Regions:
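Perimembrane loop-to-helix junctions flanking transmembrane segments
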Residues: 32-48
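Alpha-helical transmembrane segments of multi-pass membrane proteins
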Residues: 14-32
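Hydrophobic alpha-helical membrane-embedded segments
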Residues: 67-71, 119-137
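Long, highly hydrophobic alpha-helical transmembrane signal-anchor segments
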Residues: 80-129
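Outer-pore turret/helix-boundary of cation channels
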Residues: 130-162
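N-terminal membrane topogenic signal
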Residues: 1-14
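Pore domain of cation channels
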Residues: 159-167, 173-212
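Structural signature of hydrophobic alpha-helical transmembrane segments
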Residues: 47-60
């Protein structure tokens, strides 16, 4: 098995944060402006969550710029990253919950529902890929073991490995070849699996209903 991941590379760290934020904003816009009526109380809750997420994202972005300019990585950056991911995860759960709760009230086109599912899928993959990368980097002994690459047995896992792990968790409701050690990682995977199941059972079923 390969060794656990090293420290988060600055540029890839910034890239993943931006990807998470873009996916989160697209999903939030889809829910609050296109799926919920103005008089629905949940809309205000979702908007508040988005505002908090934007503020934390700006804080993370400023810290990341400082890391690049100063060529340093303070240890407290992980606390900032955990705060951002926590807010992003809560927003994801709220948005998915809003989509699921209003699924039977939707009167939208087939392709629009597919767009909803695609956004949820993309947001979930990015958010949890970053969680898995952070957990594997920071937990003692690492959180995962990845299959060894015969051509490069000492290769450390990179971003594509964690995106692949997150994608497979969405698609198969669990890891494939990876071994999960840390309890925190197991909890994160259960949350991701639950979100995927909700999307599959409710939203995909709604798509089938629209198509009939």
């Amino acid at each position: 098995m390969v060794r656990r991941a090293g420290a988060l590379p600055t540029w890839s760290f910034i890239g993943m944060i931006v990807a998470v934020q873009v996916a989160d904003r697209l999903l939030a816009h889809q829910v609050t402006f296109d799926r919920l009526a103005d008089d629905v109380p949940a809309r205000d809750v979702l908007r508040a969550g988005q505002a908090v997420g934007d503020v934390v994202f700006l804080a993370v972005a400023l810290v990341a710029v400082g890391m690049v300019l100063l060529h340093s990585r303070p240890r407290w950056i992980n606390a900032v990253l955990v705060a951002y991911l926590s807010v992003a995860t809560i927003n994801l759960v709220l948005n998915v919950g809003a989509l699921v709760a209003t699924a039977d009230q939707m009167r939208v086109a087939h392709l629009a529902l597919l767009w909803d599912v695609g956004l949820v899928y993309l947001s979930t993959v990015f958010v949890f890929a970053l969680w898995y990368r952070l957990l594997d980097c920071e937990l003692t002994g690492g959180a995962f073991e990845f299959p060894v690459d015969p051509a490069r047995p000492d290769r450390r896992p990179g971003w594509i490995d964690y995106v692949f792990l997150s994608f497979n968790t969405n698609a198969t409701f669990g890891p494939t070849a990876e071994v999960v050690h840390a309890r925190t990682a197991k909890v994160a995977m259960m949350v991701q699996t639950l979100i995927s199941l909700l999307v599959l059972v409710v939203l995909v079923a709604r798509i089938v209903g629209v198509g009939q």
